[in-house]
Each structure stands twice: as C-alpha cells, then as structure tokens.
C-alpha cells in the first residue's frame, strides 16, 4: 500500500454555479406548490450486523449449499407464519457475499414496504435486515369481493392531489401480475402510467392501495392512492433523488479567499461520471454523506474503523449546516466539515472521470456498473481525523480496495482550522490516489516509491490543486502559493509559489540536485507543470468552469483543461517509478496520442524553460543534467 503523507493545498477558480436549472418543456412537481416530502414513507427496518447474528451451529440449514435456501430458512425462523415471496434479484457479489431479497405478501398481494434482505457467505447468514409487518392481516382477500376502485380512478386521484402534469382519459390494460395494469391514453408522462394493487404499512396497519407509477422527468413517482378513496394518497416514493449541499463551491479554495461564500447546490453531480448520483451506489440509496464514490465521516479517535462513525444525515438529503470562521472547537461544525469534504471529493471524482480516470483505469467506486476495473473501493473520507495534526494523507492500495483520506486539524491559529474546508488540501490528497493508480497500472500501487518519482507524486498533487484554482482574470503572471489558509501563511507551505517568473520562482531541473525529500522535489515538478499549463492556455485560451468542454475528437478545447488531460494521460503511459525526464516524455507522447502532436512546440518550450530540454539527463547517484534546448524543428 502506498501512503502519501503530505498535504497540498490549492484554491479553485471562481465560477458561478447554477444548480438544477429549469429547462423549458420539462415536467415535474413544483416543490413550492406540492411538498412531496410530506408524503415520504417512514423507514421501519432493523438491521442485524454480522456480530449480532445468532449462533447458527444448531440450525440445520447452514449446511445447505444453496444460498437462497439458507436465506429462506432464516426468514422462516425469524418471521414464522408470515407469508412472503422471494424477489428474483439475488446474486453473489464480488466479495463472496450472496444477497437475497424477500417481499411480504398478504392474500397473494404484496405489502410494498415490508421487506427482508439476507446476506449469506460460505453457507451461513452473514447479516440481514427486516421490515416485515407483524400487525393484523385482513382476514379476507380483497380479490374475493373486489371491493376496490378502478386503477384509472387512482390515477385521477394521484394527478389531482399531487398536481401531476398528466391529462387525457386513461384506459386500463391488464399486464402480467396480480391486479397490474398499464394506463393507456394519457399525455404528459414520459411513458404510460402503470398501476398495481398493493398493501402499504401505514400507521401500524395495512392500507389497500393502488401503486400508481408516473414518470414525469424531474420526478418519477410511485404514488400509493387509497383503493377506496382517490383523494387519499398514503405515501409517495420518488425515484429521482434530489440532494442539496450548502458548501463553498468548486472554484473557491478556502473561506478567506476573495469573494468566498457558501452556496446551496442541488444535485451537483455529473450524470455521465456519476450515473447513480453521489448518494447511491446503484443498489442502496443513502441520506447521508455516502455514495458510490465516497463515504465521509468524522474520525476523532484516528482509528481505522469508519462505517459506524458519525456522519451528517438528513432524510430529505439537505446537507445545510451553520458555520462561521469563529466557531470552535472544530467538532462543533463537524456536519459542515464532512459535507464540504464529501462535496469536493465527489466533484473531483467527476472531473477526473471526464479526463480519463474511469473504472477501467482504476478509479474509486463501489459499483463500476460493468465498465471494467474492480469495484468496492470508494474513497473513505475521514474528516477531523484524530491521528495527527497540521497535515493530511491518502492511502492508495491496488484497485478493488478503498482509498483512505485523513484530513487533520491545523493548530497554527485560534480558532484551529479544519483542512477539509480547504479545497486544495482535498484535491492534493485525492490526486495521490490518481497518480498511484495510473502509474504502473491499477494493480500496482508501488510505482511512485523512488525519491524522484515520489517527489513527482507530490508535484502532480500540487499541480491539480493549483489548476483548479485558476480564475477568469488570471494570466501567466499570476502566482499561487500552496496551503496558505490552513498554515495561516500567505506564502504557503512550499519554498516557492507556483509562478512562471524565474525571479519569483527560480527553480529548474538542476534544483533537484540539492534536494533530498519528496515535497521540495514536488515543488520543482509542479513548477514545471505550471509552465506547461500557461503555455497551453496561451495557445488555446482559458476555461474557468467545473468541467471541460471537448471537441469532436475528445480533446479539451481550453489550455488549462488540456494540460490536466495530458498530465493525466502521461501518468498512464510512463513507467513504474519514473523520473522527470521520463515523465516529460510521457506527457509529450500523450499529446501525440491525443492531438497528433499539435502542441509539441508549446510543451517543449515550457519544459526547456525549467531545464527539461532535449539534453536533460537523469542521474540517480550523481548530478542530473538540465538542458534549456528545444529540439530542432519542433517550433
């Protein structure tokens, strides 16, 4: 496992974020008119973790090799006499745990919010969850007297009560399944509404309802309309998950940056990069800072356990918490801290995905959705981690194992400062995961262990942090320090700021001959890459936004995002434990692969300015040789 113990801080370019914009012609429930949250079903499930599963040594079913039978026997033992069916979505996960789901029924009709899930491993019950209804079941089947309304009446009720944009005269056409219908002849929905007769647990009793399914774009609803009173909607489920985060948006480095202000962003994820959103892994949906890409929590003890640690939770997925710079101690604003950390890490996941850090490349996700690579490795984000102070770190095991980020409290000021609130810290640490997964391949996390390679690891992290904080009015004459907020030092935590000025930052490749630790070496490498960025901006312009624009060939149209793309692609091309010269060559090769070498002149000019011209040579035990020479014929 590779541990990168440094912190790198960056600010992000100031941008205007428009969250969840209204698009003309789109349909949905206006939340100001109808509060869907008022119809939200209440959770009733219990979960029995592995440590609490009763001893199974005396149970006959443990020897059964069929995990569905094992699970079924468990349900029968826990809920004797209850009618249920096996849901047909059982499978064995890549971790060897089988998952079997059950639905409670009454008179052959589903109780729609009464479920039982059993997890089986090695022929034994691993854990289980249970929300089966144990109250009174109606003595007689409603199907016998058919004393319930027509499903089209239920659609009318849902449309009226919830003010759905559906019109027309519906006609019910029977489908496979007990009392299941497609409702034809309407308009306003993406597809024909459907209705199914189900029971719903409501106020400790069962209500017979029509479950009316309507997809109206911004909302995909299951509305439980009373089967005898169309004006009574017992509950609503919305498949479309809306979440809001009150955070410093991408483009704000820290709370003291000019113009810094928190904003509330709704559903800020990129759908192509995070198809399940940030609060779902495609199987489970969460109302806390947990999802497919990351799981964020407080870790005051500094221990390795995290699943049961505290994290902010909101049933409506509204992550908005008070914070001012004067608040102290940091534990008093841990909800905001975890929210900000979760937000920044997820945005960076989505950006890197667009730049090429995908499932097959070894990115960090629970569910890779059949797109290659190994899953079950979202990033564990520990905020206010008690294992240290005045730093941060990121552990990168091979693909298929969780990355782990530890964000510490900085004690140089009163009140103390939380590194999760500085975007550059988060981006720096996450980039260690990127560079370690790409260099040498996702299965080898030891390819940045040599001194110069490890230094470049720090440099890449500084570079992505700095690239993210570029502002619209910045020029090649703009300098950026690293870590100025947490360290309370306007000069930052590096020897020199990132600058294209050889006066304000005189470092070149020859500087590495005087350095013996990774962070100073990284300062040199990131300085080189900062030159590359501005050389490409000079040719292609600047785009200050969260995500890049690509041309038809998949090339970023702006210089700042093109630089990030080439640096990322270069990581995947370079050898295990590369040196500066090899990494330079890999970036030039990346441009050749992406653009046919259209930027060769700009790249060589930038590299040569900082001593990585064509004559540069690496020497492990002697002095490396720098060169200011641009190859003939390149420019």
Curated annotation (Swiss-Prot):
Residues 20-242 form a propeptide. GO terms for cellular component: extracellular region. Binds 1 zinc ion per subunit. GO terms for biological process: proteolysis. The active site is at 429. It is an enzyme of class 3 (hydrolase). Its EC number is 3.4.24.-. Its main location: secreted. Residues 1-19 form the signal peptide. Pfam families: FTP, Peptidase_M36. Zn(2+) binds at residues 428, 432. Keywords: Glycoprotein, Hydrolase, Metal-binding, Metalloprotease, Protease, Secreted, Signal, Zinc, Zymogen. Induction: Expression is controlled by the prtT transcription factor. Disulfide bonds: none annotated. Its cofactor is Zn(2+). SUPFAM superfamilies: Metalloproteases ('zincins'), catalytic domain (SSF55486). Glycans are attached at residue 473. Secreted metalloproteinase that allows assimilation of proteinaceous substrates. PANTHER family: EXTRACELLULAR METALLOPROTEINASE MEP (PTHR33478:SF1). Belongs to the peptidase M36 family. This is Extracellular metalloproteinase MEP. It comes from Pyricularia oryzae (strain 70-15 / ATCC MYA-4617 / FGSC 8958).
């Amino acid at each position: 496992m590779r541990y990168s113990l440094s912190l790198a801080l960056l600010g992000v370019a100031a941008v205007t974020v428009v969250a969840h914009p209204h698009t003309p012609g789109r349909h949905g429930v206006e939340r100001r008119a109808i509060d869907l949250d008022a119809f939200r079903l209440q959770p009733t499930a219990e979960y029995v973790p592995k440590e609490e599963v009763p001893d199974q040594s005396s149970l006959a079913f443990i020897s059964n090799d069929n995990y569905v039978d094992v699970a079924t026997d468990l349900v029968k033992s826990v809920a004797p006499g209850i009618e249920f069916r096996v849901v047909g979505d059982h499978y064995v996960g890549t971790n060897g745990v089988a998952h079997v789901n059950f639905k409670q029924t009454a008179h052959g009709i589903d109780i729609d919010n009464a479920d039982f899930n059993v997890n089986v491993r090695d022929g034994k019950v691993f854990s289980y969850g249970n929300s089966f209804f144990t109250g009174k079941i109606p003595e007689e089947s409603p199907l016998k007297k058919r004393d319930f309304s027509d499903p089209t009446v239920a659609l009318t009720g849902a449309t009226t009560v919830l003010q759905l944009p559906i019109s027309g005269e519906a006609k019910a056409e029977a489908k496979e399944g007990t009392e299941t219908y497609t409702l034809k002849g309407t308009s306003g929905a993406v597809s024909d509404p459907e209705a199914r007769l189900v029971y719903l647990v409501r106020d400790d009793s069962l209500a017979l309802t029509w479950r009316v399914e309507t997809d109206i774009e911004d909302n995909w609803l299951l509305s439980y309309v009373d089967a005898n009173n169309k004006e009574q909607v017992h509950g609503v489920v919305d498949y479309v998950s809306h979440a809001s985060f009150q955070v410093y948006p991408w483009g704000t480095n820290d709370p003291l940056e000019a113009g810094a202000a928190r904003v509330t962003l709704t559903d800020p994820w990129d759908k192509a990069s995070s198809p399940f959103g940030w609060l779902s892994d495609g199987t489970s949906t969460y109302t806390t800072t947990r999802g497919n890409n990351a799981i964020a929590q407080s870790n005051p003890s500094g221990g390795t356990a995290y699943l049961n640690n505290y994290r902010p939770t909101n049933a409506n997925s509204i992550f908005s918490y008070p914070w001012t710079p004067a608040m102290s101690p940091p534990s008093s604003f841990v909800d905001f801290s975890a929210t900000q950390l979760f937000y920044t890490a997820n945005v960076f996941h989505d950006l890197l995905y667009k730049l090429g850090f995908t499932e097959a490349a070894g990115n960090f996700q629970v569910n890779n959705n059949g797109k290659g690579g190994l899953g079950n490795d979202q990033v564990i984000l520990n905020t206010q981690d008690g294992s240290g102070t005045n730093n941060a770190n990121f552990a990168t095991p091979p693909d298929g194992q969780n990355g782990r980020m530890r964000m510490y409290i900085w004690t140089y000021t009163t009140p103390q400062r939380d590194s999760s609130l500085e975007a550059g810290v988060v981006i720096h640490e996450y980039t260690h995961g990127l560079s370690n997964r790409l260099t040498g391949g996702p299965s080898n996390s030891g390819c940045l262990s040599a001194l110069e390679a490890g230094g470049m690891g720090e440099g890449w992290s500084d570079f992505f942090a700095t690239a993210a904080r570029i502002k619209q009015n910045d020029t090649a004459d703009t300098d950026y320090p690293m870590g100025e907020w947490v360290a309370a030092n306007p000069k930052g935590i590096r020897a020199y700021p990132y600058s294209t000025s050889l006066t304000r930052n005189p470092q070149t490749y020859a500087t590495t001959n005087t350095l013996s630790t990774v962070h100073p070496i990284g300062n040199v490498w990131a300085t080189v890459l900062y030159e590359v960025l501005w050389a490409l901006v000079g040719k292609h312009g600047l785009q200050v936004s969260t995500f890049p624009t690509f041309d038809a060939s998949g090339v970023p149209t702006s210089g700042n995002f093109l630089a990030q793309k080439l640096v990322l692609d270069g990581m995947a091309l370079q050898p295990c434990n590369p040196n500066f010269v090899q990494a330079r060559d890999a970036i030039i090769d990346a441009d050749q692969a992406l653009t046919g070498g259209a930027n060769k002149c700009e790249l060589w000019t930038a590299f040569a300015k900082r001593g990585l011209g064509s004559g540069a040579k690496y020497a492990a035990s002697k002095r490396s040789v720098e060169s200011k020479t641009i190859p003939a014929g390149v420019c």
